[in-house]
Amino acid sequence: MALSPNSSSLDLTISIPSFSPSPSLGDHHGMRDFDINQTPKTEEDREWMIGATPHVNEDDSNSGGRRRKKLRLTKEQSHLLEESFIQNHTLTPKQKKDLATFLKLSQRQVEVWFQNRRARSKLKHTEMECEYLKRWFGSLKEQNRRLQIEVEELRALKPSSTSALTMCPRCERVTDAVDNDSNAVQEGAVLSSRSRMTISSSSSLC
């Protein structure tokens, strides 16, 4: 990391070890310099910056000074790897060896392919969960908005008569105070009428 004397910003440079030394690097022994203030210019630089493990061919593993190439799979190899991943997301050492032998790949290539495939699968699952949560949040937000409108409408209504509700002990029917008063008057009239009838009957008997 170097500080430029004529600049107010830091000139940040990092060195990342490469897999094979390049002749143009001199005595850096396979170290590559990147300015983290700038975006990577090439796909290769981007992979170096994020620390991605490149896919390599075993034919170039022993060639000194030669840059390793990315692994290019055939359609059949890709199909068989996908089928194997569907059955098992993680391979046992024996499964990895058998699959590498069958596909004419190295065990390291198969292992790296499965690592990358698991990472893509996890990322896809996370994106689906995020989309689901966004939709659920939108639904809850809309439901909350409707409830708020209903609350405001209820608050705007004029309060009804504040008559107390009571329950009739005989019929167990809930009535308000006005009904109770009218019922009491009616019951009083009936009792008074019955009393008069009883008195008149007693007088006639005498």
UniProtKB/Swiss-Prot annotation:
What GO annotations for molecular function exist for this entry? DNA-binding transcription factor activity; DNA-binding transcription factor activity, RNA polymerase II-specific; transcription cis-regulatory region binding
Q: Which residues bind DNA?
A: 66-125
Task: Locate the transmembrane regions by residue number.
Answer: none
Q: Which CDD domains match?
A: homeodomain
The terms describing its cellular component in GO are: nucleus
Q: What is its main location?
A: nucleus
Subcellular localization: Nucleus
Q: Which key words are in the record?
A: DNA-binding, Homeobox, Nucleus, Transcription, Transcription regulation
- Biased composition (Basic and acidic residues) is annotated at 26-48
Q: Which Pfam families match?
A: HALZ, Homeodomain
The annotated region (Disordered) lies at 20-68
Keyword field contains Transcription: yes
Q: Annotated region Leucine-zipper: where?
A: 133-154
Report the family membership. Belongs to the HD-ZIP homeobox family. Class II subfamily.
Function summary? Probable transcription factor.
Name of the protein in its database record: Homeobox-leucine zipper protein ATHB-X
| Organism encoding this protein | Arabidopsis thaliana
Q: What is this protein's gene name?
A: ATHB-X
